[in-house]
Amino acid sequence: MSKVTSSTLLKYKQEGRKFTALTAYDASFASAFDGEGIDVLLVGDSLGMVLQGHDDTLPVTTADIAYHTRCVRRGIERSLLIADMPFMSYATPEQAMENATTLMQAGANMVKLEGGHWLLETVTKLTERGIPVCAHLGLTPQSVNVFGGFKVQGRDAENAQRIIDEAKALEAAGAQLLVVECIPASLATAITQALTIPVIGIGAGATTDGQILVMHDVLGISSGYIPRFSKNYLKQTGEIRSAVRAYIEEVANGSFPSAEHTFN
């Protein structure tokens, strides 16, 4: 089976074929997800919450992400591997270059950065030097203290237009993928239609080109608050690989995310 690349995902978008992504943090789970056909694996800074037990993602370091990226890389053959750049690891273009290089050398195919217009120079410099970028808009968890909590973004017209404008600008700067998180489904639709690059949604409705979830939510092993946009597939299947297959099938046929997982 051929490896998934950014070109593969672009082809999927052009064909109207939905694709799936999951977080992964170790070789064993990554191998299972890869083997069942998950297209994209993200070593997310969500590990700060689901693995390290923090209340948010801010304590995660580049060294943490690099370690787990190396673990995941050893377990996969097909999936595209994206590594999150953690809080304050890309405050300047120079800092971003150094830390992104570390993550690419750890085995990532692409790095993910949260932010809008202020990131444009950084995105351009990274892509010009051979480091592919996945951008991230909407609810950006590293800005949780600015937002005043984990809240849906883009519900008013002004902020919705700002997010659309930032999405277009990030694409023009060289981003090859975009994640949109916790935004109204109508806004996600507008962004997906406005961009040539694939758009991956989480809590953003069913019209994005792909969907991503945190593996701990999919497998029902998260502690504490479970986001509305998530679904426990292990509960309905009883087996990890079957849960992953059910997730893939429901994204492909459009039954996930449903209205109960979507914000308006």
From Swiss-Prot:
Record localization: Cytoplasm
List of catalytic residues: 181 (proton acceptor)
GO biological process, one term: pantothenate biosynthetic process
GO cellular component: cytoplasm
Amino-acid positions noted as binding Mg(2+) in the UniProt annotation, renumbered to this chain: 45, 84, 114
Keyword Magnesium among record annotations: yes
InterPro entries given in the database record: Pantoate_hydroxy_MeTrfase, Pyrv/PenolPyrv_kinase-like_dom, Pyrv_kinase-like_dom_sf
Record bears the keyword Kinase: no
Record field: catalytic activity: 3-methyl-2-oxobutanoate + (6R)-5,10-methylene-5,6,7,8-tetrahydrofolate + H2O = 2-dehydropantoate + (6S)-5,6,7,8-tetrahydrofolate
Main location class: cytoplasm
Family matches, as SUPFAM superfamilies: Phosphoenolpyruvate/pyruvate domain
EC number: 2.1.2.11
One example GO MF annotation: magnesium ion binding
Cofactor(s) required, per the database record: Mg(2+)
Cofactor binding comment, as recorded: Binds 1 Mg(2+) ion per subunit.
One Pfam family cited in the UniProt record for this chain: Pantoate_transf
Biochemical pathway: Cofactor biosynthesis; (R)-pantothenate biosynthesis; (R)-pantoate from 3-methyl-2-oxobutanoate: step 1/2
Source organism, top-level taxon: Bacteria
Annotated binding of 3-methyl-2-oxobutanoate, by residue: 45-46, 84, 112
Keywords: Cytoplasm, Magnesium, Metal-binding, Pantothenate biosynthesis, Transferase
Homology family: Belongs to the PanB family.
Functional description taken from the UniProt entry: Catalyzes the reversible reaction in which hydroxymethyl group from 5,10-methylenetetrahydrofolate is transferred onto alpha-ketoisovalerate to form ketopantoate.
Subunit structure and binding partners: Homodecamer; pentamer of dimers.
Protein's UniProt name: 3-methyl-2-oxobutanoate hydroxymethyltransferase
